[in-house]
Amino acid sequence: MKKIVVLFVSMLVLATTASAGNDKPIQVSQLPQTAQQFIKKYFGDRKVAFAKKESDFRKSYEIAFKNGDKIEFDRKGEWTDIDCKYSAVPTGIIPAPIAKYVADNYPDNKIVQIERDTRSTEVKLDNRMEIKFDKQHRVIEMDF
């Protein structure tokens, strides 16, 4: 029994060490061109604190700005998650139907985080409400 516990702990330590080594600091110039253009267009006035390439299961990239905002990109340089800690997500990024829904239903709130994948887009408002939309930008879930 003792050998099994030691083996399990050893495997856990190795797995943790291996995955920790998959994050690699990079320069912004090493991001895919699509990501570089996106940052320049929507976040050009912000200073980058760090950029890293993650190679866990799928290659991805993360940028953190000195003001606390973060952007995650997929391997092609398309954004997957934008988290603006102290400001609104730039309106040009938000799909028009989602921006309209939020403006119509929550006029006093702003979108501070947006996350998308192949099936849905989820936004978080500054009042902590989360709204999930399907591919056609219809509301499918809300979390208060």
Please annotate each region the language model reported.
Residues 21-144:
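Interaction-mediating elements
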